[in-house]
A protein has these predicted regions:
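Function-determining surface determinants
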Residues: 1-154
């Protein structure tokens, strides 16, 4: 898992200033994870981006009073939708990794059953990847990054 980027806060900051810095940092962290997130061979990318989306969501929720209500509500909803799509893709990734390990531990006579489960998990992974691709396209179409940057501007 990617370690959280430090947020440069200090005791002299107002709550609103802390909100700006925190949301900007967490937003940057989220989009830094986007590279190769659709690669089904590198499942840690999805995990890292999902964790980053949770951190951003938490920051948006904690600092809600600092932002214009409508813009905040829309952005929080979109971050949640992205997190849901990341989860839809991540869950089968975890299943596949577990099933691969289980297959290695079982006798060959049990492999066909595990192979069937692996095939189903791969189908779910593919469907999750499609949902994630669509969510990422929506992020670009609706300029989520730019709107988060605008929200975080002091």
């Amino acid at each position: 898992m990617a370690k959280a980027r430090p947020v440069n806060l200090n005791a002299e900051m107002t709550f609103a200033e802390a909100a700006s810095v925190t949301v900007a940092t967490r937003s940057h962290e989220l989009f830094a994870c986007a590279d190769r997130v659709l690669d089904t061979e590198d499942i840690e990318r999805v995990h890292d981006m999902r964790v980053a989306s949770r951190r951003l969501r938490a920051a948006l929720e904690v600092f809600a009073p600092c932002f214009e209500r409508r813009a905040h509500k829309d952005l929080l909803r979109e971050v949640k939708q992205l997190a849901d799509a990341l989860g839809e893709r991540r869950d089968p990734d975890v299943q596949i990794a577990g099933l691969r390990q289980l297959r290695e531990e079982l006798p060959p006579s049990d492999h066909p059953g595990v192979d069937l489960l692996l095939a189903r998990a791969r189908e779910q992974q593919s469907a999750g990847n499609t949902a994630l691709r669509e969510a990422l396209e929506a992020v670009l179409t609706h300029d989520l990054r730019g709107r988060l940057e605008e929200l975080a501007r002091p």
